[in-house]
Every structure is written in structure tokens, then in C-alpha cells.
Design a protein with these regions (language model features):
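Bacterial Sec-dependent N-terminal signal peptides
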Residues: 1-22
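Residue-level detector of conserved, function-critical positions
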Residues: 19-226
């Protein structure tokens, strides 16, 4: 399985499956992917490695709807959130929480995932080169009340999440990245050179950040690093 295919497959799979779980509100995972010397393993909340760094790619422990709906009974059980998807030497596997490879991905086992995409309530709006936040399609730019957040940021991106009424929003201010809520309150301070616009908030209630644009790590909504 080639890396590019693996990335596309993993992202689409997790995106569909994670939105069906409404019980993990702001609870971070027990095991968190962390990279060391170019390889990824998993640490616990004490930042201790539980699964040694050995993978080229490692996702959060989460459901895989392609396997959950598989016609192959033996493969179906590995769609459980008890397992995580990893990639090593361009081959994708499911592993258990001890790091054991329990399943090697096979396209023949894949089933189609039902679409669970949620329409976002809020979206970024650009005016005069600055980004704000709106919750409707038709905006009167002269009416301040038409904006949820008046345009003032260099960039805004509404992160995918379980709660569309209270999204986390990646923002750029003074060329630094941070996270705000819909009221403009700072959740993650503007101290990072980059925050990845991926599904880490949806899947793990965490943000993948970097201070130098090269090395990335996860922080929770209290900006605690892992």
C-alpha cells in the first residue's frame, strides 16, 4: 500500500467514523502519537512512551468504518476504536494498544463508509484582506452585527469537530498561529509558527502545532504539550 493512498484512505475513513462518536467531548485519548528521531510512537498522559517510536505514520486510536462495515468477519473486528492505523515501510496496519500489528490492510476487505459529513455552521469571511467569522451566506459588510467575529485576522480556519455550534478556530495574528473560539476568546496562545489544519481536533481533541515549522507535537485545549 503506497503512502499517498494510505494517507487519503486514512483521512477519509477516520473523518466518516469519528463523527458518529459523541461521547468524547474534550476528552483527550489515552494514547497520543508522538514523533522522535523521525519515527512515531504513542505516549500516555505522563508523556511516557507506551508504544516505542517505530512507524512512519500513526493515527489516533479510533474507529475505521471501512472495516466496521466489511463483509470479511475476520477483518470487521479490527474496525473497533480499540485499534489504531499506522504505516510502516509504506504498508498500513491496525495495531492494538500494546503496539502489536493485528491486521494488515487489504483493499478487498474495504466496505463503503456512509457519509456522515456535518455542514459547518460558521465559516471564515475575508474583507479588505482580513478574515472574520460569519454564520450566514449573505453579509452586509457595512453592518457590524452581520459578523460573529469582525475581520481582523490574517487567516481563519474553522476546525472540524463534534460540536458545530462551538467550533475551534485556527487563527493567524502577527504571523503567528493560535486557536480562538467563536467569541474571539484565545484558547491556544498565538505563539506557534504553524498549526496543522487536519482532523486532530475532531479525532483526538488536540491540535498539532510547531514552533519552528519543522517539528510538530500535540497540545490539548489548555496548551499542554504531549
Amino acid at each position: 500500500m503506497k503512502t499517498v493512498f494510505g494517507l487519503i484512505f486514512i483521512i477519509s475513513t477516520y473523518f466518516c467514523s469519528a463523527q458518529t462518536d459523541s461521547t468524547r467531548v474534550n476528552k483527550i485519548p489515552d494514547l497520543i502519537p508522538q514523533k522522535m528521531n523521525g519515527k512515531v510512537g504513542y505516549v500516555n498522559h505522563k508523556r511516557e512512551y507506551v508504544i516505542a517510536p517505530q512507524f512512519h505514520l500513526a493515527m489516533f486510536f479510533n474507529s475505521d468504518c471501512n472495516l466496521l462495515n466489511s463483509q470479511n468477519v475476520k477483518a470487521k473486528k479490527f474496525g473497533s476504536p480499540k485499534y489504531a492505523t499506522v504505516e510502516e515501510n509504506e504498508i498500513a496496519y491496525r495495531i492494538d494498544k500494546k503496539g502489536n500489528k493485528v491486521y494488515k490492510y487489504n483493499k478487498k476487505d474495504f466496505a463503503k463508509c456512509p457519509s456522515m459529513i456535518k455542514t459547518q455552521k460558521y465559516k471564515a469571511y475575508i474583507m479588505n484582506g482580513f478574515f472574520g467569522l460569519v454564520n450566514k451566506d449573505s453579509i452586509n459588510e457595512g453592518n457590524y452585527k452581520d459578523f460573529v467575529i469582525y475581520p481582523q485576522y490574517q487567516r481563519l480556519h474553522v476546525m472540524e469537530g463534534d460540536d458545530i455550534n462551538n467550533p475551534m478556530i485556527v487563527a493567524v495574528q502577527n504571523n503567528l498561529f493560535g486557536v480562538i473560539d467563536k467569541t474571539g476568546k484565545t484558547i491556544i496562545p498565538f505563539i506557534y509558527s504553524d498549526i496543522k489544519l487536519n482532523y486532530s481536533w475532531l479525532l483526538g481533541k488536540m491540535f498539532e502545532v510547531s514552533v519552528d515549522g519543522k517539528e510538530y507535537f500535540y497540545v490539548d485545549e489548555n496548551n499542554m504539550a504531549y
